[in-house]
Amino acid sequence: MNNAAVSLIEAVVETAVYAEDLDQIERFYRDVLGLNVIGREPGRHVFFQVGNHSVLLVFNPQATLSGGVFPAHGARGPGHFALGVRSESLNNWRQWLTDNRIAIEKEVSWPRGGASIYFRDPAGNSVELVTPGLWGTPAGW
């Protein structure tokens, strides 16, 4: 990038996925994955804090088609996102998911380092728990 007036993008601040049953999604992300709810509008969205720097936005896909305060948006089919966890906690997460009857879809050990566990949320979105090393980036992920 050659424009000195524009700084480098530093982070993904929000990630959005879509689900029709927001009550079920709220229970899953709050009670199973331990995320804190930071915003809710019944029938439209539920938002979760992820770590110190990002937010997971879950929208009812029908409620965002026409726009409003935000531009219209949406997606068809399941989405995917990854949540970072410490390497030493991956076995505990595997057991926690099993104890909560969450089917593990796939496990991967990555060539650069890091490992991932994939599973689905109640809306069918692919959720990945990943340990540092996956991308070999300075931040560790």
Q: What is each PLM-predicted segment?
A:
Residues 1-8, 11-20, 49-51, 69-141, ...:
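Vicinal oxygen chelate
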Residues 2-4, 66-71:
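Short beta-strand/turn micro-motifs at beta-sheet edges
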Residues 4-7, 30, 73:
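Structural motif
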Residues 18-63:
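Core segments of cupin and vicinal oxygen chelate
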Residues 41, 63, 88, 110-112:
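Short beta->alpha connector loops
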Residues 44, 54-55, 77-79, 100:
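A generic structural signal for short beta-strands and their flanking turns/coil linkers
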